[in-house]
From Swiss-Prot:
Induction comment from the UniProt entry of this chain: By alkanes.
Keywords attached to this entry: Heme, Iron, Membrane, Metal-binding, Monooxygenase, Oxidoreductase, Transmembrane, Transmembrane helix
Function: Together with an NADPH cytochrome P450 the enzyme system catalyzes the terminal hydroxylation as the first step in the assimilation of alkanes and fatty acids.
Organism: Candida maltosa (Yeast)
Name of the protein: Cytochrome P450 52A3-B
Cofactor: heme
Family from the record: Belongs to the cytochrome P450 family.
UniProt topology in membrane: Single-pass membrane protein
Transmembrane segments: 17-34
GO annotations of cellular component type: membrane
Gene field: CYP52A3-B
Length: 523
């Protein structure tokens, strides 16, 4: 066949739109691949192993992740997956162009969060979270984040001591709810989530939604707060969808059902009610509110009167102040109920410091005196080690950069991270690495925190993140959890776990909690 005839037959296909589109896409992907290879060579980088089940386009890998999340098994799926990669890192690509590096290496986590902080940002998190959380400290980067942090930092610097006294009325209601079960099995986690929404709304808004009040107690819940009865459930549902949007990466926009939009509206309705109430208050009313006890919203109103800013920051703090503390309390009591020796040892320390039962000296419990309870601190450290509030997180590269190690056959080479790529770090697995925590890394053992091996963990223990974006409210959460556990230890001598599954399935939204609830009996 003559060359002219071949050209004559092929040429019409070369001018078709789909051929041009395919050629352009192929050229684009090839140019990206060649560019990345060039910089890998120039920077003496090597890729870690490729994620075996991701496939070339990465979609199968994302589907597996979402399935595991929906089944309550994402944390353990990640744990088991990293066991297949001895150098603690691997990577995948999505749609042939987005590189995702997954790591549990403390040195890589340190680079992302601290030493190379300016090389990474939240990436698409704002788009993922915007429908519920808007422009707040957890969704913003750059100057917006710096402004938010500067605005919020003072709110957590001056509140700790008075905070424990404000908890006691809510603890009393919590205890009444527990005692209603008369030693029978009940879901303690469900009560903790109601408890923390009550304490968080009082701290943030100046009024509690009193979700622990119900007909069983003979105390009717308040009905003067619009949207109060729907708030907690709507907040939970919205976070479920936000998590799915996050794990969907660039396909987040596909998760936007009517239920999600309706729940966001319900959450915003309650927040707007409190914001408008604060903005409508006179200066004398604001001053009077402050005298009656610290109120986050009324302090924030002194800095800005923008209702959108107030709403967004309040909801951002609500995620941290409510969900992380509820998860920490739930997992701590889950393990304490399974380990009576640990529970009894903890009660002995609390008896020495504050008394038990009818001899409990509640007035002596404060921010300062709680810090003296070393075993209580070890119990919380161990809970956060095994069940970190945010077990999986990610950052996006703002420029071409590298991670210090994990590449190549021996895992010692740096990894090239192109601009726009994501680094997913899984502290849930980091906290279980044998080289840092020993052969019993999967065992709940608070005593490890008195051993020399845990004094130099560095970035192998990051329950509250690290670097410039370290959690502002970590001491606030630890103080609240310490107070609640202390008071429960004073009131209940015997705990018994009724959960049959171990390790437990874990629900990961924006934070982590027990997937099925924490079922115990308490006497």
């Amino acid at each position: 066949m003559a060359i002219e005839q071949i050209i004559e037959e092929v040429l019409p296909y070369l001018t078709k739109w789909y051929t041009i589109l395919f050629g352009a896409a192929f050229t684009y992907f090839l140019s990206i691949a060649l560019r990345n290879k060039y910089y890998e060579y120039k920077l003496k980088c090597e890729n870690p192993p490729y994620f075996k089940t991701a496939g070339f386009v990465g979609i199968p890998g994302l589907i597996d992740v979402i399935k595991a999340k929906n089944a309550g098994k994402l944390a353990d799926y990640a744990d088991q997956t990293f066991d297949e990669y001895p150098h603690h890192s691997f990577y995948m690509t999505v749609a042939g162009m987005l590189k995702i590096v997954l790591t549990v290496d403390p040195e890589n986590i340190k680079a992302v969060l601290a030493t190379q902080f300016n090389d990474f940002a939240l990436g698409a998190r704002h788009a993922h979270f915007d429908p519920l959380l808007g422009d707040g400290i957890f969704t913003l980067d750059g100057e917006g984040w710096k402004h938010s942090r500067a605005m919020l930092r003072p709110q957590f610097a001056r509140e700790q001591i008075a905070h424990v006294k404000a908890l006691e009325p809510h603890v009393q209601v919590l205890a009444k709810q527990i005692k209603l079960n008369k030693g029978e099995t009940f879901d303690l986690q469900e009560l903790f989530f109601r408890f923390t929404v009550d304490t968080a709304t009082e701290f943030l808004f100046g009024e509690s939604v009193h979700s622990l009040y119900d007909e069983k107690l003979g105390v009717p819940p308040p009905n003067n707060i619009p949207g109060r009865e729907n708030f907690a459930k709507a907040f939970n549902t919205s976070q479920h969808y936000l998590a799915t949007r996050t794990y969907s990466q660039m396909f987040y926009f596909l998760t936007n059902p009517k239920e999600f939009r309706d729940c966001n509206a319900k959450v915003h309705k309650l927040a707007q009610y409190f914001v408008n109430k604060a903005l409508d208050a006179s200066e004398d009313e604001v001053a009077e509110k402050s005298k009656g006890g610290y109120v986050f919203l009324y302090e924030l109103v002194k800095q800005t009167r923008d209702p959108k800013v107030l709403q967004d920051q309040l909801l951002n703090i609500m995620v941290a102040g409510r969900d992380t503390t509820a998860g920490l309390l739930s997992f701590a009591m889950f393990e304490l109920a399974r380990n009576p020796k640990i529970w009894n040892k903890l009660r002995e320390e609390i008896e020495v410091n504050f008394g038990l039962g009818e001899e409990a000296r509640v007035d002596e419990i404060s921010f300062e005196t709680l810090k003296k309870c070393e075993y209580l601190k070890a119990v919380l450290n161990e809970t956060l080690r095994m069940y970190p509030s945010v077990p999986v997180n990610f950052r996006t590269a703002t420029r071409d950069t590298t991670l210090p190690r994990g590449g190549g056959k021996d895992g010692t080479s740096p990894i090239f991270v192109p601009k726009g790529s994501s680094v997913v770090y899984t502290v849930y697995k980091t906290h279980r690495l044998e080289e840092y925590y020993g052969k019993d890394a999967y065992e709940f053992r608070p005593e490890r925190w008195f051993e020399p091996s845990t004094r130099k963990l560095g970035w192998a223990y990051v329950p509250f993140n690290g670097g410039p974006r370290i959690c502002l409210g970590q001491q606030f959460a630890l103080t609240e959890a310490s107070y609640v556990i202390t008071r429960l230890a004073q009131m209940f001598e015997h705990l018994e776990s009724k959960d049959e599954t171990y390790p437990p399935n874990k629900c990961i939204h924006l934070t982590m909690n027990h997937n099925e609830g924490v079922f115990i009996s308490a006497k």
